[in-house]
């Protein structure tokens, strides 16, 4: 999926609002995903998955940091997430559909915290960006 110059600008704009809340939004995204899609819990058998868990907060911060990294390197998402792509494809072997589920949950978190900023145009750009991130993270599965 190709991001237009306008999409890139929109993504950078929304990430400027959310990057200071990385741990909070990342953890909330994971909690929402675990609740809505309980099958995703299977990748975290060693985690305390309860609300407010330190492990969920720490991993949520990593998830948000990866998204911020991708947004900061929006012209080279593949390069920015190369090591993470290798990790998920070769070691963790996460089912690729889970990246889409995570993206949906992230979108909901952004909508909850920044409803006026998530205009239809921004929403479309963020969706394209999250799809691009998911494509990068699954590119080495083939």
From Swiss-Prot:
The keyword Iron applies. InterPro entries: Globin, Globin-like_sf, Globin/Proto, Hemoglobin_a-typ, Hemoglobin_oxygen_transport, Hemoglobin_pi. Residues 2-142 form the Globin domain. GO terms for molecular function: haptoglobin binding; heme binding; iron ion binding; organic acid binding; oxygen binding; oxygen carrier activity; peroxidase activity. Belongs to the globin family. Red blood cells. This is Hemoglobin subunit alpha. The gene is HBA. Keywords: Heme, Iron, Metal-binding, Oxygen transport, Transport. GO terms for cellular component: blood microparticle; haptoglobin-hemoglobin complex; hemoglobin complex.
